[in-house]
C-alpha cells in the first residue's frame, strides 16, 4: 500500500514535468498554457534593427554603418567603407 502511494506520487510528479500543462492566470479567471520559453506576443522579432553594418555591406545612410565607417556610393551601390 505504501509503495503504491509512492509510485502514484512519483508518476504524478514526472508527468507534471514532462506533459504540457496549464496554469491559472494571475487573476484566476482563465487557464493559460504553460511554456518554458515565453516570448512577448505583441513584439515582432522579424524586423529588429541590426546594430550596425560591417565593411563592404550595403547601406542607405552613414548611420547604418558601424562607428568609424561611412556610407559611400560607388557604381550605383552604397556600401560601408572605413572613414579617413
UniProtKB/Swiss-Prot annotation:
Domain topic, free-text comment: The presence of a 'disulfide through disulfide knot' structurally defines this protein as a knottin.
Signal peptide bounds? 1-16
Q: Which domain of life is it from?
A: Eukaryota
**Which GO cellular component terms, listed alphabetically, does the Swiss-Prot or TrEMBL entry include?**
extracellular region
| Key words of the record | Disulfide bond, Knottin, Secreted, Signal
Q: Which cysteines are joined by disulfide bonds?
A: 52-66, 59-71, 65-80
Main site of residence? Answer: secreted
Q: Which family does it belong to?
A: Belongs to the UPF0499 family.
What is the organism lineage in this UniProt record?
A: Eukaryota, Fungi, Dikarya, Ascomycota, Pezizomycotina
- Kindly provide the name given to this protein in its UniProt entry: UPF0499 protein NCU07353
Q: Where in the cell is it found?
A: Secreted
Amino acid at each position: 500500500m505504501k509503495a503504491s502511494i509512492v509510485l502514484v506520487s512519483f508518476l504524478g510528479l514526472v508527468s507534471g514535468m514532462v506533459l504540457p500543462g496549464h496554469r491559472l492566470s494571475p487573476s484566476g479567471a482563465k487557464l493559460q498554457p504553460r511554456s518554458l520559453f515565453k516570448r512577448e506576443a505583441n513584439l515582432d522579432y522579424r524586423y529588429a534593427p541590426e546594430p550596425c553594418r560591417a565593411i563592404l555591406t550595403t547601406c542607405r545612410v552613414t548611420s547604418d554603418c558601424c562607428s568609424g565607417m561611412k556610407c559611400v556610393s560607388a557604381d550605383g551601390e552604397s556600401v560601408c567603407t572605413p572613414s579617413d
